[in-house]
């Protein structure tokens, strides 16, 4: 699920230079004019703009290497915080698929339809997470604070098959970017239902098994003050969880 996340600007001092695993050139590219224009777009809802300080949109766009003309799948996009940004950056020559799983479609389709009505380059796509297909190869598959949910039995997802389908859907050289709430070291996926967290190393190993190359991690929404012991919806930590952001690349 999607509680608000914590921004790079608030965390840099606490993290220190050792934690900055993204090259400086990637961080400076967050100032790309297209990213700034998307963030400043007057059509964005005010409640989404109010969350920018905590969701690091420019850093996320830069880390995901979003560019004009790309085709992007935003998996379970919710209200479309990132979908709107992607739509503005890829422009009329690109396309964004708002992928809504069949199991949650009744509740989530209306929100996706708001996005398709507002952006002609966005379309809603329904399907099973472990049977995803797209009409053209993708440049980017993006998943924010959702991966852990897909391990919960009620979602009925074969996560290994999901990752394999994402690998297949991407162009050679395409990216798979995942944001999620960090769990305590050594806990793997054991906290997915109790705390809504997943251990980053566990997720990384799962994705690599699908053939992806782990390329980089961004500290943009990290919070070292989070000890990983609380449910992400607990008021003591909600909106300030420690989150990892991993970038995987399909070889080619």
Question: Language-model segments: which ranges?
Answer:
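A short acidic, Gly/Pro-enriched loop at the edge of an enzyme's catalytic core
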Residues: 119, 132-142
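Core SAM-dependent methyltransferase catalytic element
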Residues: 225-252
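Conserved class I S-adenosyl-L-methionine
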Residues: 68-78
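Class I SAM-dependent methyltransferase Rossmann-like catalytic core
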Residues: 35-63, 67
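A short SAM/SAH-binding and catalytic strip from SAM-dependent methyltransferases
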Residues: 139-160
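Conserved Class I S-adenosyl-L-methionine
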Residues: 188-216
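Conserved beta-strand signature within the Rossmann-like core of class I S-adenosyl-L-methionine
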Residues: 173-181
